[in-house]
Amino acid sequence: MRLSKFTWFLTALIAIIYTATLIVIRIENPHHIQAESYRCWRETYIIKQSANRAFVNTSNNRAKPVALSEGQGYGLYVTAAAGQHGWAKSRDFDQLLNYYLTHRDYVGNHHQIPTYLMQWRQYQKNGHWTSDINSATDGDLFIAMALHQAARVWPKRASYYRNLERHLTSDILAYEYNPHTRSLTVGDWATSKSKYYRLMRTSDVAPTFFDTFYQSSHDQRWRIVKNGMLDHLADLSAQHRTGLVPDFAWVTADSAKPVKPWTVASKNDGNYSANACRVPMMLANSKDPRAQKTLTRMMKFFSRQSHVTAGYTLAGKKLNHYQSASFSAPIFLAVSRNRNHGYDNLFASQKFIFSKPLPKNNYYDATLTTIAAMEGMN
């Protein structure tokens, strides 16, 4: 039976509409994942302390909230990224920023010298909020980078944000930098009088951050930090066939070695664990050959695994048999930024983090997943 011209036209039109719909869905899906990740993360983990102040709850229990400088840094970073899409306003950013500014750390023998570094933890004790002294470098780095991004997203506030960025990056170099090891320390408490002065957190190796801070300040020390810390990370990666690096390492001017268990916080201080899992994310956007080589070694190890699990010894033995978004999200972000490098299979295998709702009782998993969505789904 011959079809009429109208029937052919209608069939063709339906086919075109169907194909166009599939294309739109495919194009819009990453955008939808980004928007939903941010919305769920914001609603679950942001707590407003007052009309002008908010913090990221890291405790996974809204009844017993805990703020960390790490979490506040991530919160500012994510909010600035959301602002690029119009999902966050400068007011949202400023509420998180005001909380940071209210909890700046003091240094000196009697903690009498104010800084722009953030005190590392706040929580409720006997019905009152208390803030623990000392800073944590990872939080300060993300706060500074978020300020830089915010200046571009909200131009009317740019001078204010840039001024704060300059103060903060200056204080990072003043109080969280060891010139003898060419590295950032883990916090302002690790002074030259401390046995931890030579301790390096591998996830603080942030070459693109350091490039940005140098371009903003023209302070040559940021180049020294970048070169020193990338050298140390490459040294650590080359010590094992896996290319994996530990959470923490002891460093000198020209050497690095993993720490022993319980040196800092846990039995896994010298393994690829809860801190080092962020390293792929921190190297993802760097074109420096040392960063690329270290990242490639690590990623090829992961690409050979049937499932990437939550942590490994540096020799490649699994620490756990379950998967974790804290480990998979940074890997997804790294592979999404570095396609055709010999580990593309990780793009599909680690995408599972977006196949289920954002965790509502795991701040770390949820936050790293949100960062991976915002930066890796473009």
Residue map of PLM features:
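N-terminal Sec-pathway targeting helices
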Residues: M1-I16
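Low-complexity, Ser/Thr/Pro/Gly-enriched N-terminal "stalk/linker" regions
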Residues: W8, I17-E70, A81, W87-T130, ...
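Terminal, non-catalytic domain-edge segments
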Residues: T21-I25, A276, M282-N285, A334-R337, ...
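Alpha-helical solenoid scaffolds that mediate protein-protein interactions
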Residues: W41, A82, F93-H103, V107, ...
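Aromatic-rich carbohydrate-recognition surfaces in CAZymes
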Residues: P65-G75, T130-A151
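Extended ligand-binding clefts on enzyme/binding-domain cores
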Residues: V66-E70, N109, T115, T137, ...
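Short glycine/serine- and small hydrophobic-enriched flexible loop segments
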Residues: L76-Q84, F142-V153, T208-Q215, M281-N285, ...
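Alpha-helix boundary/capping segments in eukaryotic regulatory proteins
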Residues: G83-D92, S131-G139, V153-S159
